[in-house]
Amino acid sequence: MTVHTEYKRNQIIASSEIDDLIFMTKPQEWSFEEQKEIRDKLVREAFYFHYNRNEEYRNYCINQHVSDNLHTIDEIPVFPTSVFKYKKLHTVTAEDIENWYTSSGTRGVKSHIARDRLSIERLLGSVNFGMKYVGDWFEHQMELINLGPDRFNTNNIWFKYVMSLVELLYPTEFTVDNDKIDFEKTVKHLFRIKNSKKDICLIGPPFFVYLLCQYMKENNIEFKGGDRVHIITGGGWKSNQNDSLDRADFNQLLMDTFQLDKINQIRDTFNQVELNTCFFEDEFQRKHVPPWVYARALDPETLKPVADGEIGLLSYMDASSTAYPAFIVTDDIGIVKEIREPDPYPGVTVEIVRRLNTRAQKGCALSMANVIQKNIKD
């Protein structure tokens, strides 16, 4: 399908090579090796940017015996996301911070992340970039129904904000207020858009989509989506883990409820507040890491990269963030895979398997966090 997606380009300031990459290109434009070369260059540039402008991060690097004379980007010091729970770390000046965003806080203390205008614009660009894995429509060809609040009512909770950004790409109806779904309104818009002959994109947390399916089943609502409905989830099940379905069962529930033609009409996304990029799935439901982000799986105890395709502690270096150094080790255990030609979607994929759960693994992460706390002073 030809690329037709239009976003508010007059709101975007394309200031560099990375902005051209994020805002003006498609995911399938480069080979695996070309993506690798692009990633190396952009991550290096991001490291130099933060190293030279952020004294706290530079001191941390020096403590790790790392200067700005890198041999490989694997040498770039990363830190656990828990640092952002206790330290407001930012590279840009306080005057340039557009907003502070928080995690959902389902696991206790919230992370606080500063973002300037350019970082926010690049996040929007990553959503537009990722949507091209799903399909490409003129603005008048599709409408979205968001099982969440609009971006003015997210209370700075990061994932809600990320999901609300689609409003800037396509006409969008929001059907959740104060974390309560208006089921009647949602169903009304489903049928309205269907009758308008436009395609429909339903987005929201998997638990909310699950609740909508239950409502439609209980009320005997039959909806024949065919090939015109696309469902995009994100954010995980969080505090609703007891109600969670495995991916195969969840796929089947959506296929049955919305009478979809193909399973590839269902996509999941990944983002976290400490990461400035949203990862989208391709038609095979594999989450792709864009070429401006370097993803690795690390040994939880040594923090050394494991072999391609092996399970480890997920770490990201995101070159799109100017507000803060987005060089992080997460609490997620997962798998990073290199996808090469002749696959139609060459690049790097990530699969999140589970959270850290052993005392040894958490101890390693906490030990690393303590080291950083001593070297990044308030």
From Swiss-Prot:
Keywords: ATP-binding, Ligase, Luminescence, Nucleotide-binding
Pfam families the UniProt entry points to: LuxE
Domain of life: Bacteria
Transmembrane intervals: none
Enzyme Commission designation: 6.2.1.19
GO molecular function: ATP binding; long-chain fatty acid--protein ligase activity
One example of a Gene Ontology biological process annotation: bioluminescence
Family (UniProt): Belongs to the LuxE family.
Its biological purpose: Acyl-protein synthetase activates tetradecanoic acid. It is a component of the fatty acid reductase complex responsible for converting tetradecanoic acid to the aldehyde which serves as substrate in the luciferase-catalyzed reaction.
Organismal lineage: Bacteria, Pseudomonadati, Pseudomonadota, Gammaproteobacteria, Vibrionales
Associated pathway: Lipid metabolism; fatty acid reduction for biolumincescence
Broadest EC class assigned to this enzyme: ligase
Catalyzed reactions: a long-chain fatty acid + L-cysteinyl-[protein] + ATP = an S-(long-chain fatty acyl)-L-cysteinyl-[protein] + AMP + diphosphate
Name under which the protein is recorded: Long-chain-fatty-acid--luciferin-component ligase
